[in-house]
Amino acid sequence: MNMGTICVTGTASGIGAATKVKLESLGHKVIGVDLRNADVCGDISKVAERQRIVDEVIALCGGALDGLVPCAGVSNPASNELKVRVNFYGTMALVNGLRSALEKGVDPAVVMISSNSTTMTPGLSIEDALGFLNDDEETTVAKYGVGDTYIPYPAGKLAIAFWVRMKSNEWMQSGIRLNAVAPGVIDTAMTRPLLDVPVMAERLKMIPIPRGRWGRADEIASAIAFLLSSEASFIVGQVLFVDGGTDALLQPTVHPHPLP
């Protein structure tokens, strides 16, 4: 990608903020989206606000967008309903809403945010992710948005990974490369409070990380910047795990998988 205009959501903190800094350091113009302190302020959990956010981004980029990184997301202690609405349906509304602008961009690319929780969460099923993909938002909220189940977060992130794989050919026919990163445990303002919750702190400590430490937001941003760049021009439909080796350690023979 040449110096272009890239929309990044969740730029007020964490991976989104680090991605904005990284892309701007490379000379790109970044249109930031977040609840506050952004070029476009809005709440993607609210259906009524999503189209306005899309319209404002399109206005700021002049109708042509070269890249999109929907980083906005929530984890614990956010409610399960919020996880469903923000992490999947709000994200997908913006991605689909900005497709027409991406089609007018130069060598456009989208990098979605999945998670390595997709491959290490007990009880998570493929059917959970397919439910996000196939059901409408309110149906999914009714199913997963109540109670204390931990499934909504990894299910939504698995649905994003599936969507990238399923739609990469279709979007490539419009000239848009789709890929995703799957971060592991990253030291951000969203993750640190989990250490104050005994159950979550114990779970985090149990995660094996061959690299020997948590990841940094700038390390995820670097992977995102690479996937957006022309250096990744032949990479399409991939989910890149950036997790310090956790996925490879736990599932060494899963990828690549031969055809049946």
Language-model regions, residue ranges each:
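N-terminal Rossmann NAD(P)H-binding glycine-rich loop of SDR-like oxidoreductase domains
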Residues: A12, G16-V21
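Rossmann-fold cofactor-recognition segment
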Residues: L35-R50
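Catalytic loop of short-chain dehydrogenase/reductase
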Residues: S75-P77, E81, E103-S174, V185-I186
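Short C-terminal tail/terminal secondary-structure segment
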Residues: V236-P260
